Amino acid sequence: MKKFLYTMIAGASLALAACNSQPQSTDMASQKKDIGLQLYSIRQLIGNAETFATNGDSILARLAGMGYTCVEAANYGNGKLYGMDPEAYKACVEKAGLKSLSTHTTRGLSEEELKAGAASEETMKWWDECIAAHKAAGVEYIVTPWQNLPKTLEELKLWCEYHNAIGKKCAEAGIKYGYHNHAHEFKKVEDQVMLAYMIENTDPQYVFFELDVYWTVMGQASPVEYFKKYPGRFKLLHIKDHKEIGQSGMVGFDAIFKNAEVAGVEHIIVEAEAYECADMMDGVKLCADYLLNADFVKACYSK
């Protein structure tokens, strides 16, 4: 515990020092890497329709200037992203020199559907509209960001069948479908670890996993062990730390990236939920700088 606290304090001190230091001049051309940002990381700035309309152009341009190449959306509803028609969202992102790569959105199964043992026709129609909107937005990956811990293994099996059905619909539209973990997926449902069961009971043809490396560590599991046990299942990675990336010492990023090929990684996406930096855009830049300057991070992972 003392070692953990020391590491956290030391990491926080380094992050604060980096936030307060003068920006270093870097040759972005020589350090160009394919790095995405989950826009939830800056939700206070462009987290909804109103703030995106006000700040979207300037914030996205700043992200491109930091070295980010693509974004993952986190605000979809009623056929729109951040209150915009899909085509308008795509144009806004591309105007900044970024790519509309992926999104976090989902519709869960209701208690009635769980009791019935199947998703309703209304739910699957919702997915048809969702997929069509994201196709128009140029999105390549749709990711379900959350699912509660099921009460029984039978319920978890139903969720896996649901993910397969969504994934099949996405595949028919030329979009890849995945699931993003937090820490609770490493708990057991009856005698099965939730995430392991999900990986083993979803069709690789239709469902991939976006492993959040920080939440995996917080769930007392090893990202690298999951890569080796389930090779090729992790097309996206959420690169996350306690705060700014690389500052806590909690996550073994070098080993994670050295095993990215085994995992099947196609893109890496930064997500930050809290910052040492007073200005979150400074924190987002620190995350990009860490990855741009890390020798163990390749320029591109997509095939």
Language-model features: locations:
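Acidic/histidine-rich catalytic cores of soluble enzymes
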Residues: 30, 70-71, 171-257
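Aromatic-rich peripheral "rim/lid" segments of glycoside hydrolase catalytic domains that contact
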Residues: 259, 273-303
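Bacterial N-terminal signal peptides
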Residues: 7-15
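Hydrophobic faces of well-ordered beta-strands that scaffold small-molecule active sites
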Residues: 33-39, 71-73, 100-105, 142-144, ...
